[in-house]
């Protein structure tokens, strides 16, 4: 089955986890940014999972170097443009790029400049390629609560101009949603859609609380609902889409193999799952690679993929007009 030729949708892709290694090298040389190595083969080991990774926290260490080259307007615009260029080459028709603006203030940029630069890169790529993109703003759970309010408030002026949603990301502690009730209440009032990283690192109850306390419309990962019957039931009853990222889940040791990943069980039980990369560079993956692995190890069929694709259309935060265009591509999904 040629998954490369099929239309695709990406709902969970981190900008700072999806840079070209060549671009990291190029910017580092241009801006005099120190790197542990300027040899591409050696540098890959610092920004990608090559052999083994023991935890989510270890996985997150791979973002340190990419963020060093994402501190100017020019670089942010370029990196956003290149991401859309890369996924368009993989026949992705729509992508929701997510990033945390406060990771890019080291050289004095303000939040508005940071968001604007990324949006410019997205819009430039849209003009050249058959792809549409939107932006999800991330609030870092390892920063203080006032910083989350700052992102919500300052990012709100871009709602309707390319920004569609708010997210909570970084390491996952049990019962984190309770700390962010007021932040997400404000986000909802501002008009953001809401997707929350939860149930990625062993705590299924976080998914339950993300939905009940934070009004999450989608869940990033959510795989540990398998260990929390109440969360599983709520996700199924409310038809909450899960942004599943299989290779990333293997890298963070959520599961030992594709065969033991609960994705197919969720799909067969009617859970609204979507397939995503999480971080193309860190996990050395693409949507096509994800689908090929699921086909090889889990028996993913063309019929299954059509369900996944239409799930992603429905789950997306795209405009009604864009959703209609995306639905029309489903006719191309044939073996």
From Swiss-Prot:
Catalyzes the hydrolytic deamination of adenosine and 2-deoxyadenosine. InterPro entries: A_deaminase, A_deaminase_dom, Ado/ade_deaminase, Metal_Hydrolase. Zn(2+) binds at residues 12, 14, 197, 278. CDD domains: ADA. GO terms for molecular function: 2'-deoxyadenosine deaminase activity; adenosine deaminase activity; zinc ion binding. The gene is add. GO terms for cellular component: cytosol. The active site is at residue 200. Belongs to the metallo-dependent hydrolases superfamily. Adenosine and AMP deaminases family. Adenosine deaminase subfamily. It comes from Clostridium botulinum (strain Kyoto / Type A2). Pfam families: A_deaminase. Its cofactor is Zn(2+). This is Adenosine deaminase. Signal peptide: none annotated. It catalyses: adenosine + H2O + H(+) = inosine + NH4(+); 2'-deoxyadenosine + H2O + H(+) = 2'-deoxyinosine + NH4(+).
């Amino acid at each position: 089955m040629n998954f490369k030729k099929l239309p695709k949708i990406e709902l969970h892709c981190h900008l700072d986890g999806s840079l070209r290694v060549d671009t990291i090298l190029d910017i580092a040389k241009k801006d005099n940014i120190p790197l542990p190595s300027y040899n591409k083969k050696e540098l890959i080991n610092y920004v990608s999972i090559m052999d083994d990774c023991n935890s989510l926290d270890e996985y997150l260490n791979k973002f340190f170097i990419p963020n060093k080259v994402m501190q100017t307007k020019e670089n942010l615009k370029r990196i956003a443009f290149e991401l859309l260029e890369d996924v368009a080459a993989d026949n992705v028709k729509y992508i929701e790029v997510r990033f945390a603006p406060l990771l890019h203030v080291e050289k004095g940029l303000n939040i508005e400049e940071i968001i604007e630069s990324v949006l410019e890169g997205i819009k430039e790529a849209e003009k050249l390629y058959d792809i549409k993109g939107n932006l999800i703003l991330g609030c870092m759970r390892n920063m203080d609560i006032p910083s989350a309010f700052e992102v919500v408030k300052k990012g709100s002026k871009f709602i309707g101009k390319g920004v569609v949603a708010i997210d909570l990301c970084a390491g996952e502690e049990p019962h984190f949603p309770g700390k962010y009730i007021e932040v997400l209440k404000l986000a909802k009032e501002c008009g953001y859609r809401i997707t929350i990283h939860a149930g990625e690192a062993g705590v299924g109850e976080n998914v339950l609380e993300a939905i009940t306390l934070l009004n999450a419309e989608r869940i990033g990962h959510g795989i540990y609902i398998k260990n929390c019957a109440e969360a599983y039931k709520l996700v199924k009853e409310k038809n909450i889409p899960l942004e599943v990222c299989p290779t990333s889940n293997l890298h963070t040791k959520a599961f030992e193999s594709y065969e033991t990943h609960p994705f197919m069980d969720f799909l067969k039980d009617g859970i609204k799952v979507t397939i995503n990369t999480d971080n193309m560079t860190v996990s050395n993956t693409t949507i096509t690679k994800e689908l090929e692995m699921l086909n090889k190890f889990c028996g993913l069929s063309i019929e299954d993929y059509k369900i996944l694709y239409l799930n992603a259309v429905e789950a997306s935060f795209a405009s009604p007009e864009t959703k209609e265009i995306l639905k029309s591509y489903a006719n191309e999904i044939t073996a």
